């Protein structure tokens, strides 16, 4: 089975439309903000204190999309090397699905008092390999292409929280 759907629809955004990103209260006490519990579980604070914040590392985040990463303030200091859309070549990875945005925030956010990720000083490639409109085996090929692209641009680490075992057609499940 190979599935090919309609191309993604780009919905134009007005540059001045920031109403969806209202200021939120900063949590008190910790420079890690909302990420404090998460980074404590990984002993990340000790790593940061020892100077390990991702500097010199190239990380590829392979996911379903990175909606509004280019507009969210916790990513203002993001060291973005580039983006690549395997599903819709040439299209922006910053529209559509936001799962990759959430994953990236755990890694790259750098807004002390609000949220600091585990590797805020790393350099990042954002790669879209998931077509979130449906689930078909072709997405495994997209994922493989994303891994090959990440390797070709010299990344050190890949973060991918995608998995495939259940599809829209039951006969394709494993």
Located regions from the model:
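Short acidic, glycine-rich surface-loop motifs adjacent to enzyme active sites
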Residues: 148-174
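Hydrophobic C-terminal alpha-helix "anchor/cap" residues
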Residues: 1-2, 107, 150
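Short, acidic/polar
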Residues: 142-147
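Conserved residues at the C-terminal ends of beta-strands
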Residues: 3-5, 130, 161
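Subtilisin-like serine protease catalytic core
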Residues: 35, 45-140, 153-156, 167-169
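Autoinhibitory propeptides
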Residues: 1-38, 48
